[in-house]
């Protein structure tokens, strides 16, 4: 039953559909087609576009999955976790900026290396700013 239906579609209905399509003789003939003729061509053009895409898809470049990159590339890599302790009472200057991007040459103090890091990666990391409270 199913094979008979498929056979009827392929042998009878598909050729009849293709014969009724308003395919022009020349490329310039496409410019003279009316809106209703274009609408009759849409299913065929859609199927041809889908088949074309499925044919070239294996050759298209694959999108690489973005994986998280390491933040700390070189500072105290021998330690499993880098922790710096600073007593707030020991602040001598009114403001101190500490690095959070791990790119600072003066780590743990920020040297504004995060600006270049943010431009390159689109990240939004910034320093930790400690302010001495004035009474």
Swiss-Prot record:
It is a single-pass membrane protein. Keywords: 2Fe-2S, Autophagy, Endoplasmic reticulum, Iron, Iron-sulfur, Membrane, Metal-binding, Mitochondrion, Mitochondrion outer membrane, Transmembrane, Transmembrane helix. Residues 61-135 are cytoplasmic. The chain crosses the membrane at residues 38-60. Its cofactor is [2Fe-2S] cluster. The keyword Nucleotidyltransferase does not apply. GO terms for biological process: autophagy of mitochondrion; regulation of autophagy. It holds the Pfam family zf-CDGSH. The keyword ATP-binding does not apply. [2Fe-2S] cluster binds at residues 99, 101, 110, 114. GO terms for molecular function: 2 iron, 2 sulfur cluster binding; metal ion binding; protein homodimerization activity. It is found in: Endoplasmic reticulum membrane; Mitochondrion outer membrane. Residues 1-37 are lumenal. InterPro entries: CISD1/2, FeS-contain_CDGSH-typ, FeS-contain_mitoNEET_N, MitoNEET_CISD. Binds 1 [2Fe-2S] cluster. PANTHER family: CDGSH IRON-SULFUR DOMAIN-CONTAINING PROTEIN 1, CDGSH IRON-SULFUR DOMAIN-CONTAINING PROTEIN 2. Regulator of autophagy that contributes to antagonize becn1-mediated cellular autophagy at the endoplasmic reticulum. Participates in the interaction of bcl2 with becn1 and is required for bcl2-mediated depression of endoplasmic reticulum Ca(2+) stores during autophagy. Belongs to the CISD protein family. CISD2 subfamily. This is CDGSH iron-sulfur domain-containing protein 2. It comes from Danio rerio (Zebrafish).
């Amino acid at each position: 039953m199913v094979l008979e239906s498929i056979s009827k579609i392929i042998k009878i209905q598909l050729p009849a559909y293709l014969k009724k399509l308003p395919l022009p003789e020349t490329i310039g003939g496409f410019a003279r087609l009316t809106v209703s003729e274009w609408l009759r061509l849409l299913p065929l053009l859609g199927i041809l576009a889908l088949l074309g895409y499925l044919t070239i898809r294996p050759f298209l470049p694959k999108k690489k999955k973005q994986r998280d990159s390491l933040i700390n590339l070189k500072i105290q890599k021998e330690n499993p976790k880098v922790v710096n302790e600073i007593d707030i009472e020991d602040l001598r200057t009114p403001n101190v900026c500490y690095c959070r991007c791990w790119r600072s040459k003066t780590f743990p103090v920020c040297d504004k290396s995060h600006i270049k890091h943010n431009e390159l990666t689109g990240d939004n990391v910034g320093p930790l700013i400690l302010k001495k409270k004035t009474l």
